[in-house]
Amino acid sequence: MYLSVVTGFSSWLGNIFSDLSSLNQINLKINYFRSYLEYPETFNRNNGVTNPANDCPKEIELKNVSYRYEGANHHTLQNINLKINPGEHIAIVGLNGAGKTTLVKLLCGLIDPTEGQIFYDGIDIRKYNRDAFYRLFSAVFQQFSILPVTIGEIVSETTPENIDYDKMKRCLTVAGLWNKIEQLTNGVDSQFGKTIYDDGVEFSGGEIQKLLLARAMYKNAPVMLLDEPTAALDPIAESTLYENYNQISFQKTTVFVSHRLASTSFCDRIILIENGKICEEGSHNELLKQNGTYRMLFETQAKYYKNNLGKTEVAE
């Protein structure tokens, strides 16, 4: 009987500590949610320029832009001066943590610079109605969330009765996903994910990237931002994307972020960011001739592939 009491007490005590741990985790989540709700709204959402020209891309300019994340001891980006011409295809490259994604977020207004100004069509983006400004951009980010709705609703971001199905098919085809969708029982009307629907479809990481790319194309905004859009693609799918890049970016300003330097050679201009600053810029060939950091990184990646190819041939 004594042993039963001790065992029961130990189990009861263990459950208490487990519940306290769960309560602490829930409390942290609640505090995080509260801090989000209490975060001051700095964006201009109630007034401002409500009709920025979105029929064609305009000039984008960053003047002395710096950004430091809240609580950080140093700036992620420092004194960035950059002008992007209408319809220009820009590549942003650099090592991990260089500030590439932060720069993309600044361009589309997800965050405002700590210092400096960003202009779209000669107007400081803070003067735009922020919701109207967001409509100028189609973006594919590394971090994303997809709602459990139909594939058609994901791509079009609208209700089924408002979907342009011909346009959606073209976008899915260029993104390399139409053959997959066509084989599904309900096609674009298939529910995505099994969070709510047991018969929902699930995609691989590469297929999700294609889906997000199709969504960005469907929006047909004048500026397209692609942050590592090929990170989860297999080599064949990646090659197909590069072959279709001109079709994807036709008459648009595009900003292509990648750590694979061979994938940026088709861009008009390449911006190399190092330690939060622009250290080199130019075309692929121009940067190779400079014998700088870009060339060193490019040759390092090329050497890796050559060495692996040599090992494969020896093994055979």
Model-identified regions with their sequence ranges:
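Helix-to-loop junction immediately C-terminal to a conserved catalytic motif
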Residues: 108
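C-terminal portion of ABC ATPase nucleotide-binding domains
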Residues: 187, 243, 265-316
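Primarily ABC-family ATPase nucleotide-binding module
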Residues: 34-91, 170, 247-250
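ABC-fold ATPase nucleotide-binding domain signature/coupling loops
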Residues: 178-211, 220, 304-316
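Catalytic Walker B motif of ABC-type/P-loop ATPase nucleotide-binding domains
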Residues: 224-228
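Cytosolic ends of transmembrane helices, especially the final helix of ABC transmembrane type-1 domains
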Residues: 8-39
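ABC ATPase nucleotide-binding domain helical subdomain, centered on the C-loop/LSGGQ "ABC signature"
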Residues: 117-119, 134, 152-198, 242-243, ...
